């Protein structure tokens, strides 16, 4: 992956490499059943994002109970029960990470786990999660001017080209997200790099559909593993 960056953007800073080590992978695997449950019931979970955010900001706890859905978090202890299916686990990362996970990070981990199978099959290589990269030349940073960073939700290679994916579990309202996805993909991967918008919902408004088409972004909203593999194979031809 660093080969792409050194070739196309040699002066850009890599703040977070996005390499998932064995310990981090274990944590993702521990949460896999929860990520699967959240995806299965995403229509009910996603509208709760704002309430979850507000609750956590107020007391660093989450306590929601309605319509056969219970969600509890306090002091790293997690309990989610949806229609009688209950998952309990201890979230041992830093305190704010579970909030990030439950309001969208779970979908990134869900897609990451899907792509692990393509990694095993050697359809893709060098899979990364949550890379953070400088979008300015480090030489331009002077005095108190702070660098601007871009986060790549998921990045991988097919052995030849860079692929960057933006994962959206909630409604996409800002066209700027698509512009940033396209721009950053080209900066770090060159003209042949591919960008993918991965969404939990197939409903894109007219304006966003046009933007996706103009920017040549592949939109995938179901059968993620299969559709990503097909996209890679078609791109190789």
Indicate residue ranges for each PLM-predicted region:
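Intrinsically disordered, low-complexity Ser/Thr/Pro/Gly-rich regulatory segments
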Residues: 1-237
């Amino acid at each position: 992956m660093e080969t792409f960056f050194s070739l196309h953007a040699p002066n850009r800073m890599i703040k977070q490499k996005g390499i998932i080590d064995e310990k981090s992978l274990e944590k993702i695997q521990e949460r896999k059943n929860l990520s699967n449950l959240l995806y299965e019931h995403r229509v009910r979970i996603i509208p709760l994002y704002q309430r979850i955010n507000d609750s956590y900001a107020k007391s660093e706890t989450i306590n929601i109970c309605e319509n056969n859905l219970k969600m509890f978090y306090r002091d790293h202890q997690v309990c989610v029960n949806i229609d009688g299916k209950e998952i309990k686990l201890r979230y041992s990362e830093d305190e704010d990470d579970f909030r990030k996970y439950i309001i969208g990070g779970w979908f990134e981990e869900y897609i990451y786990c899907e792509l692990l199978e393509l990694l095993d099959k050697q359809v893709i290589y060098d899979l990364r999660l949550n890379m953070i990269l400088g979008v300015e030349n480090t030489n331009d940073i002077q005095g108190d001017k702070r660098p601007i960073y871009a986060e790549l939700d998921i990045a991988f290679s097919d052995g030849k080209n860079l692929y960057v994916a933006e994962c959206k579990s909630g409604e996409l309202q800002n066209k700027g997200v698509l512009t940033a996805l396209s721009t950053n993909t080209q900066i770090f991967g060159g003209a042949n790099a591919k960008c993918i918008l991965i969404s939990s919902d197939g409903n894109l408004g007219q304006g966003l559909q046009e933007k996706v088409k103009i920017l040549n972004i592949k939109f995938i909203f179901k059968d993620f593993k299969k559709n990503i593999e097909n996209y890679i194979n078609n791109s190789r031809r």
